[in-house]
From Swiss-Prot:
GO MF annotation terms: ATP binding; glutamate-tRNA ligase activity; tRNA binding; zinc ion binding
Domain of life of the source: Bacteria
Organism of derivation: Cytophaga hutchinsonii (strain ATCC 33406 / DSM 1761 / CIP 103989 / NBRC 15051 / NCIMB 9469 / D465)
SUPFAM superfamilies: An anticodon-binding domain of class I aminoacyl-tRNA synthetases, Nucleotidylyl transferase
InterPro entries xrefs: aa-tRNA-synth_I_cd-bd, aa-tRNA-synth_I_codon-bd_sub2, aa-tRNA-synth_I_CS, aa_tRNA-synth_I_cd-bd_sf, Glu-tRNA-ligase_bac/mito, Glu/Gln-tRNA-synth, Glu/Gln-tRNA-synth_Ib_cat-dom, GluQ/Sye
Binding site for ATP: K269
Span(s) of short sequence motif 'HIGH' region: 14-24
Catalytic activity annotation: tRNA(Glu) + L-glutamate + ATP = L-glutamyl-tRNA(Glu) + AMP + diphosphate
This protein's UniProt keywords: Aminoacyl-tRNA synthetase, ATP-binding, Cytoplasm, Ligase, Nucleotide-binding, Protein biosynthesis
Protein's name in the database: Glutamate--tRNA ligase
Quaternary state and interactors: Monomer.
PANTHER family for the chain: GLUTAMATE--TRNA LIGASE, GLUTAMATE--TRNA LIGASE, MITOCHONDRIAL-RELATED
Principal cellular location given in the protein's record: cytoplasm
Amino acid sequence: MSDTNKQVRVRFAPSPTGPLHIGGVRTALYNYLFARKMGGKMLLRIEDTDQNRFVPGAEAYIQEALAWVGIVIDEGAGVGGPHAPYKQSERKPMYREYAEKLIAEGNAYYAFDTSEELEAMKERLKAAKVASPSYNMVTRMQMNNSLTLPEDEVKRRLDAGDEYVIRLKVPRKEEIRLNDMIRGWVVVHSSTIDDKVLLKSDGMPTYHLANIVDDHLMEITHVIRGEEWLPSAPLHVLLYRFLGWEDTMPQFAHLPLLLKPDGNGKLSKRDADAGGFPIFPLDWKDPASGDTWIGFKQQGYLQEATTNFLAFLGWNPGTQQELFTMDELIEAFTVERIGKSGTKFDINKAKWYNQQYMRQLPDETLTRLLKEEADKHQAKYDAAKLPLIAQMLKERLTFAKDYWIEGQFFFEAPETFDEKVASTKWNAEAVTVISAYKEALAAYTGEFNAENVKHVLHEVLEKADVKIGKIMQALRLALTGAGAGPDLMQFIEIVGKEEAIKRMQFALITLSEKVNS
């Protein structure tokens, strides 16, 4: 096993077959937090052995996504380092060397089977009621490979350039044990493992061989990856042993699955599409189909909120604290506090995190975001009043775009009114008070500020013998079109005397039929 005195080295090793799923970002984040906590290094390796599934732009997307959530790569693709190259397609020659070593020592073999022969084998096993037909320790002895063919025939085929793959020779009747950092001891019998292909006919390695060779050569001490790789872990343990690297084998930690919001099954792109929430960190456009998906960033999620949300998808600090800076996450993070069972993907929790972080933004940032939203809608405004509006609305924000959704009435007079509020709060008494208030404001000649317009309102209410609570929603309705919102007196100060009077007059005319109905 890995030497506990060595510097911790972890890697994130995605395949450039499309955009990086948010679950992949979580895996990268856990690797990063662990490396930083242990004073170690974080590597990025691109596992592009499957050239048929390679997608242009995917590698750049991966690097941009990791940078956006605050992950700093110490070594690897895009950075360089002593173990370059960090793309598996550029390391192709070295994998053959290790595959041939496995053959020479009796732990792998050449397999010359055609696709037709492989299909015939599967059909034969299905007919014999074998539940999961596979190329394994039993069926390999009935196939065309270097275990069944004479040595001179194998040599002839190799010399002739016949197509072949190299398969792992899984031992018979053996228990393979793995002590996972999250799940504890995992014990698998070798009879359940098939003879996986290690080197494909095009000379490219499969994931199983390439990741073992690269992890060893890059001195990886801990492999933190998704639960979907747990069934392959015993196979990887065998490879470490067969290659003579058992003593330096990294420690494994297999992360719990990200589940659908209802908890029934693994989270997928289809679930995100159906639920109307993002599943990729950044916008993505498929270069083949032209289909597009919006990312967390472009939907308005802040980097800090997204990172915090992802950290809690399977891990918890064991305290009541929920908001963490990256440095605080690093300090608190331990693999031992990662759960074994799958975690529901709760987009409402992601929104909650964004709300908290929006409220913590500096005043100048909030003002800038408000200005950007107002400019998008070509609104007219007094720039000097924007900081106050930004502060008044910040408690109502989930995303920056909510500045317009929640505060459009600061910039534009309402043309429609909340029907529910109008039907319950707009009555003869409200009309009398609002009419009187409109006239009182028109006659008022003092400084027009929140405190003074409130004083004028109280004078009107006292004369009419009406409690403020009875007409406040109706007054807000007249001024903003809604029944709830920020401080109304401050609002009146911001829009100004002339605009406030004009809005009340419009409401009195437009809603007058409510009184008579």
